[in-house]
């Protein structure tokens, strides 16, 4: 099961994030799926697709690389790094045109080849600093 679930995570990052394929969201999420850590919990494919559309609008060229991945039973933990250009206003901030790099970690729980629950944590503050929305305090 661990090997199959790791393949699903690879597919998720490749197709959903790097290629922007929303059909994969419908294939891998169910109405029972809950994604945590991206603001309010996202429940089901439609809620995730709304977040995904806003994010891809803000960073249409996002590329995510999997740096490390471990799996046990129905869980997969992944450490990833991303690069993109902030060229859209999908997240509510005017496009800055700035290149960004950030990293994060996630844990995905699978049942019957479906992503049922996901937990996400990434450097949101660093990302906001890079696009000029949040300034570092003067030292």
What positions do the PLM features span?
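C-terminal and inter-domain tail/linker signature
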Residues: 1-139
